[in-house]
């Protein structure tokens, strides 16, 4: 029996959440503002540093900070910063809590909080190779006597930026195109079948077919779904489909800390991934550290995300795009059209196009103009039909789900200024 006043893991998270929610938005928000005033002479730490802020009409992009953390999550992180705890125990408890929160997650699955989706990939692949064997964990990236090959589709590989995280554990990536290639490639060295969810349209083997190949040979399958929330259902859809490990970014649609992520999957593989990461040593993933504040922040952010009315949010995001479109329709030679990306950043988006005979602008010069203001406005020069250089393109793609209230008006004003400043 614990002594009075001793830390009790059973009620730590419940107490923490209740404290943060009960205090918000009054005392905690006031305290946060007071702390911000102490931290910044000007009212903005970025002004103090001379770093220009950005209005994010682009999306959950790591280059510009991903997403903004909610005040409730900040309050939970602040509370977590006030005590020391066992990181190993905190990871176990939050992982179990998250598995309970995701009610559709298969019964033999659990979760762990990671250092972003990239950390989930690196430690998840390592865990598949080593299990919880301390000698094998210590041996990485030397795979002598261990399985060493990861099968990946060529159509995914050509646009995928996270192969270094796969290879970090010493693996060799074997590229395939068609199911018959997979059958030929599988051998006694095959450790994993790897899938990049956003690239599903680019490969010949689709997401549901890929898992069937893994099951046929009893080989674990990993799916990188980093930016694939919303929709909420994606958080469990691929585990239910049969994927053994699924990675999500915490700092994108979930609006958790930018350096956090989620790894969901079979309990044995999730535990193995955790033992290949911080705070355990010696491990390949020792540098994949997530602090206690970020662990708690990721848990709280997910709790908030699951409680939100997603259809209402979609309507709000669409309304912001409608406002900008209405302002731009007043300009002769400018048009707008709506679409929703099929997988990653699956939220309302708008393509803004212009007639090059009326405006001396390309996608690249438009992005440069918007980025030159203070605050800058960030958009995407890509989208359906985009070229690599954007030198000849005449459109931008705008996303609204990272805009703060009222920023759509600034975006519309800046766009109108841009068009007026660049007549053909």
Task: List each language-model region with its residue ranges.
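Structural signature of PLP-dependent enzymes
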Residues: 302-326
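Conserved C-terminal alpha-helix-loop-beta "cap" of PLP-dependent enzymes
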Residues: 329-418
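Metallocofactor- and cofactor-centric catalytic cores in central/energy metabolism, strongly enriched
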Residues: 63, 67-68, 74-75, 79-97
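Flexible, glycine/charged-enriched surface loops at secondary-structure junctions
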Residues: 87-92, 107-111, 285-289, 308-317, ...
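N-terminal secretory signal peptides and thylakoid transit peptides that target proteins
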Residues: 1-19
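Conserved PLP-enzyme active-site core in the AAT-like
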Residues: 13-16, 20, 37-55, 59-64, ...
């Amino acid at each position: 029996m614990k002594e009075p006043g001793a830390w009790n893991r059973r009620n730590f998270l419940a107490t923490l959440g209740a404290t943060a929610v009960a205090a918000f938005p009054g005392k905690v928000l006031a305290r946060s503002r007071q702390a911000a005033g102490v931290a910044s002479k000007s009212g903005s730490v970025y002004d103090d540093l001379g770093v220009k802020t950005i209005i994010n009409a682009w999306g959950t992009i790591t280059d510009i900070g991903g997403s903004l953390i909610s005040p409730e999550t900040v309050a939970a992180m602040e509370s977590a910063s006030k005590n020391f705890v066992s990181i190993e125990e905190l990871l176990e408890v939050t992982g179990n809590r998250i598995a309970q929160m995701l009610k559709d997650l298969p019964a033999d699955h659990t979760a762990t909080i990671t250092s972003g989706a990239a950390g989930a990939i690196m430690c998840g692949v390592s865990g598949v190779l080593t299990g919880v064997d301390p000698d094998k964990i210590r041996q990485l990236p030397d795979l002598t006597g261990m399985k060493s090959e990861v099968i990946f589709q060529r159509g995914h590989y050509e646009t995928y930026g996270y192969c270094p995280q796969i290879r970090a554990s010493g693996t060799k990536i074997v590229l395939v195109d068609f199911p018959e290639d997979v059958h030929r490639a599988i051998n006694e060295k095959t450790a994993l079948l790897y899938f990049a969810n956003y690239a599903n349209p680019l490969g010949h083997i689709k997401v549901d077919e890929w898992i069937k190949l893994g099951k046929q040979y009893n080989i674990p399958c990993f799916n990188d779904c980093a930016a694939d929330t919303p929709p909420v259902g994606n958080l469990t859809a691929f585990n239910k489909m049969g994927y053994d490990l699924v990675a999500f970014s915490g700092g994108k649609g979930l609006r958790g800390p930018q350096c956090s992520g989620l790894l969901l999957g079979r309990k044995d593989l999730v535990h193995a991934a955790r033992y290949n990461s911080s705070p355990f040593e010696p491990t390949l993933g020792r540098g994949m550290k997530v602090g206690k504040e970020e662990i708690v922040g990721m848990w709280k952010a997910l709790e908030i995300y699951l409680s939100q009315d997603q259809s209402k949010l979609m309507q709000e995001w669409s309304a912001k795009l409608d406002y900008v479109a209405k302002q731009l329709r007043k300009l002769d030679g400018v048009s707008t059209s709506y679409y929703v990306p099929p997988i990653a950043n699956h939220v309302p988006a708008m393509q803004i196009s212009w007639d090059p005979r009326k405006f001396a602008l390309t996608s690249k010069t438009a992005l440069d103009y918007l980025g030159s203001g203070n605050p800058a406005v960030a958009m995407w020069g890509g989208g359906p039909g985009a070229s690599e250089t954007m030198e000849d393109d005449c459109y931008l793609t705008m996303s609204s789900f990272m805009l703060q209230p009222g920023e759509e008006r600034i975006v519309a004003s800046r766009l109108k200024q841009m068009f007026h400043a660049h007549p053909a």
